[in-house]
Amino acid sequence: MITKAVFALFFPFMLVVLFTRVTFNHYVAIALTAALLFASYLKGYTETYFIVGLDVVSLVAGGLYMAKKAAEKKEE
């Protein structure tokens, strides 16, 4: 359970960062990460709502981080 919680905190954040670097658009990256998370929920890899909540928090944090980076890049 602790391992899944740690992974739920880090992996969605890192996926948003990775997909943003690949697609050059943080909105697309958030959508791709959310789609992967939704597919894993449907497949049954999530046991508790606590893990789902951690996934959502990490996804939002990744989106906010990349939005901040995009704003910094526009200022340059």
From Swiss-Prot:
Q: Which UniProt keywords apply?
A: Cell membrane, Membrane, Transmembrane, Transmembrane helix
> Transmembrane segments in this chain: where?
6-22, 28-44, 50-66
Top-level lineage group: Bacteria
Q: Looking at the UniProt record for this protein, which Gene Ontology cellular component terms does it annotate, in alphabetical order?
A: plasma membrane
State the membrane topology: Multi-pass membrane protein
Segment forming the signal sequence:
none
Q: What residue ranges lie in the Cytoplasmic compartment?
A: 23-27, 67-76
InterPro entries registered for this protein in UniProt: DUF2198 (IPR019242)
Q: What is this protein called?
A: Protein CsbA
